[in-house]
Amino acid sequence: MNKSILLLVTLLSLYSCTDTEKTPLEEKDVFNEDYIKTSMIKALEWQEAHPIFAIHPTDWTNGAYYTGVARAHHTTKNMMYMAALKNQAVANNWQPYTRLYHADDVAISYSYLYVAENEKRRNFSDLEPTKKFLDTHLYEDNAWKAGTNRSKEDKTILWWWCDALFMAPPVINLYAKQSEQPEYLDEMHKYYMETYNRLYDKEEKLFARDSRFVWDGDDEDKKEPNGEKVFWSRGNGWVIGGLALLLEDMPEDYKHRDFYVNLYKEMASRILEIQPEDGLWRTSLLSPESYDHGEVSGSAFHTFALAWGINKGLIDKKYTPAVKKAWKAMANCQHDDGRVGWVQNIGAFPEPASKDSYQNFGTGAFLLAGSEILKMR
């Protein structure tokens, strides 16, 4: 993922969401059903009126955004969400983006699959482009699979960066479910395990973003100023958020389901341990002082995943205060016009955000979180 135009971040903007100029929410019940639904719709309306993407309307940024829109519709049944989903699917001609080897470029198909599952009109949806992408992505050779694409990120496995575990596996899983072709799920598991074995730190129970941040025990290891390993909040949010989406649709009797349940629980326990007091995770999970202000996209993915686990009974109620604290802090990061601020720009490692910085995937993460907070009331 290449960076788009960087938002200007000044020293004056580096403070927590809870200290913004926005009117504090202490007097409002941010857990009131109407308040949550209104906040979510305002976020949708603002984002639809201010489209943004990295390289194309079908890229991963919109993939993550419209995944949030789909889950918001799933919970609320508000047709404004479905209208947005259908409009973009038709405008995109139901196409993923063009790089068939790249997990990022099929993330948009989660929204297509969701529309197809919920649309009563025959022949409205066209999932053939998604099938073509998945068949090529999973079953045909490319330089990454062959291990010949040597680079600083070590692009020698298909999903060499942890973000990929949000982008492709939930789509593959949902397609396998809808098409009744479980063999797709087995292929997904094969590539998921490659990423897990390379990037998951079993001691820290967190994922390195890519091979650059994996410790080998030498002087070349990347460290934070405090000497800790570099673990990116949004990167781990991609993973645990993707796990929630994956487990949502994975068959209960799938032979590898226990692996994903256990990984989810391990990560959830670690994410809970390192939550800052104000509720929002910092962009650097083990060095919060590096950028000592909350960041919404990673925090929203964490909140979505934890709330989902509580609602499904996978984790117990001890997580509830943390989820509520995070949601309250995120609510204070939403501008009055609906824009979701304090979102780190496109990147691959911890960097600062500001109260005015936004991205469509940050809005999508906010909608994901809200969709599960609504069920917790």
From Swiss-Prot:
Class of the enzyme per the UniProt entry, highest EC level: hydrolase
Catalytic temperature dependence: Optimum temperature is 40-45 degrees Celsius.
Signal peptide (from-to): 1-16
Alphabetized UniProt keyword annotations: Cell membrane, Hydrolase, Lipoprotein, Membrane, Palmitate, Signal
Topology of the protein relative to the lipid bilayer: Lipid-anchor
Lipid linkage positions (S-diacylglycerol cysteine): 17
Lipidation (N-palmitoyl cysteine): 17
pH dependence, record text: Optimum pH is 7.7.
Active site feature: 163
UniProt subcellular location: Cell membrane
EC number of the protein: 3.2.1.-
Superkingdom field: Bacteria
The name this protein goes by in its record: Unsaturated 3S-rhamnoglycuronyl hydrolase
Species, as recorded: Nonlabens ulvanivorans (Persicivirga ulvanivorans)
